[in-house]
Amino acid sequence: MEQNEFGLVEKIVYLNRVAKVVKGGRRFSFSALVVVGDAKGAVGFGLGKAQEVPEALRKATERAKKDMVQIPLVDGTLPYEILGEFGAGCVMLKPASKGTGIIAGGAVRAVMEAVGVTDVLAKAIGTNNPHNVLRATMAGLTSLRSAEYVSQLRGMKLEAPRK
């Protein structure tokens, strides 16, 4: 995991080179998809486009830092099972017991490592496009609600879980 000077974890999810065909030949451009998190529950993603790779990465990282959201975590995993959807992409995320690790691939793994989840089971269904999988993962994570928040919404007292 690559950490910057602010203690944020930066992960490059996808780097793409695109070509625009012009009269004189091909003009290349780059796009970068980056996930940034503090490994304590905050995570954001950004897409940057530029003529050079470092500039695309810088733009993506800046956008990711600007759009960070807080995710409620419970003992290094998710509080409950969720389904995130975006476009054709659907990501299923399940909490896992301690010691399981991050069982996920590609974009989902990058998000989980950046957010600070240590144990999770995930499956991406419908598409393997990194953009859509990443957005579906983020849609699922942002829909998570903590037990305290739900009890406050319902006007009830939070009780200890039954064993």
UniProtKB/Swiss-Prot annotation:
One of its GO terms (cellular component) is small ribosomal subunit. The keyword Signal does not apply. GO terms for biological process: translation. It comes from the Bacteria. Residues 8-71 form the S5 DRBM domain. With S4 and S12 plays an important role in translational accuracy. Located at the back of the 30S subunit body where it stabilizes the conformation of the head with respect to the body. Belongs to the universal ribosomal protein uS5 family. Part of the 30S ribosomal subunit. Contacts proteins S4 and S8. This is Small ribosomal subunit protein uS5. It comes from Nitratidesulfovibrio vulgaris (strain DSM 19637 / Miyazaki F) (Desulfovibrio vulgaris). The gene is rpsE.
